Amino acid sequence: MTDKMKIIEVKQSVFADNDADAEKLRKELKSEKTFLLNLMSAPGSGKTTTLVQTINRLEKDLKIGVMEADIDSDVDAYTIAEKTNAKSIQLHTGGMCHLDADMTRQGVKELDTKDLDLAILENVGNLVCPAEFDTGASMNVCILSVPEGDDKPLKYPLMFTICDAMIINKIDVCDYFDFDMDNKWDVCGIIA
C-alpha cells in the first residue's frame, strides 16, 4: 500500500436490509400475539394438503390465516379457502422464486393479522431460494416428501439447517422408493 492508494473494507451482507426488515416484522407480529410460520419445500411435496389437514385440526382453537406464495397461480389459495375456514390470500411473486421480508409484510397487511393467532406463509415451492431469505417468521418448517429422495438434506443443506422442524411426507409410499428414514439426517443437525 502506498500513500496514493488506500483499501477500505465495506463488506456487508446483501441480505442486511432484508434481515433488519424481517426482525422488525417478527417483533411487530409478536406484539400482536400473532405467530407466523413459514412453510417451505419443493413443488409437489404436499405443502397445501398438509396445511388443509393441519388447519382443520387447529381451527376450532385458533384463528388462522394463510398466505399462499406462487409465481402466478391461485390454485393453493383457492384450495385453502374451499377446504378450510381459514382466511386465504394469494401472493404472486411475478417470477421470483422466494418471498423476502417486505413481500411477507405486504401479505401480512392484506391478511390483517391483528385478529389471528396463527399466520401461515406457504412459500414458493423451491428448495433453494426460500431458504436464503428471512421472511420475519417465528418458525421455519420444511417438508421433505419420500418421492423426492432422502438425499435432499445433502444436496440442499441450507434449507434443512435453517428450519426449526422438518416433516417427512408421503411416507405411505416409502416401500416403493429408495428412501432410508435413518439416512443422513445428522448431516444437517436433524434428529429423526
Where are these regions (language model features)?
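G-domain G4 guanine-recognition motif of GTPases
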Residues: 42-43, 67, 93, 145-146, ...
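Nucleotide-state-sensitive switch-loop elements of NTP-binding domains
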Residues: 4-27, 32-37, 45, 49, ...
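Catalytic acidic motif of RecA-like/P-loop NTPases
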Residues: 41, 125, 148, 157, ...
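C-terminal lobe/tail of nucleotide-utilizing enzymes
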Residues: 1-14, 177-192
